[in-house]
Amino acid sequence: KLGEQPRSFKDFLRIITGSKGGEGASVSDQINVLGSHTIGYDFCLAYSGSDWNAKGYYQHICSDKSGTEFRNGADGLWGMEFAFPKFKWIEKVVVEYMCTRNQSGPFHLIDFDHKAHPGRGGGGDNYYNNGEYTTGNSYFGKAVGSSLILSPEYNTNHSTGFRDNRIQDFHFALKGALSPRVDYKLRLTVMNGWGTHAA
């Protein structure tokens, strides 16, 4: 978007360590971090018994420092999985809840003049989008990550960004066997979308 980006080895180290950009970076990358980042933390508790197994998990999503500090609430994927290896009718049950509505709040709150306006910023994380890279977290118009975040290839106005990244969904899945020759999988996903904080 903005022409040539910083590309020295020092800039590479800034990107992989999530550090602020140097003098050659845009003002935005000097205030936040250099480059575009999507970060995830995975937490899981599991139980294995003789007749059944259970797993509870949370995958925290964030795209900047405010999210790494969990200032984006409970955004991410919450799930439970139950497996019954000895009970073929229902071998596995999965229940998941995903929410990306908080995004550290609706406003970015980072003023570019930090000497005149010191303090913490954050908010308006705008998942999957990036101010420096207009195609955001996509590859040839397709979302890299959750398939529930509508890919830019579906934008009727041909814009390259993500227009609906604030979602809430519930996902249910069953897997089993009705007989030795008949397996089944049932899946149901119910979702709502709220566009972006800016929309």
Residue ranges of model-derived segments:
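C-terminal structural cap/anchor segments
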Residues: 106-197
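Signature for the C-terminal beta-barrel architecture of outer-membrane proteins
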Residues: 1-113, 170, 190-194, 198
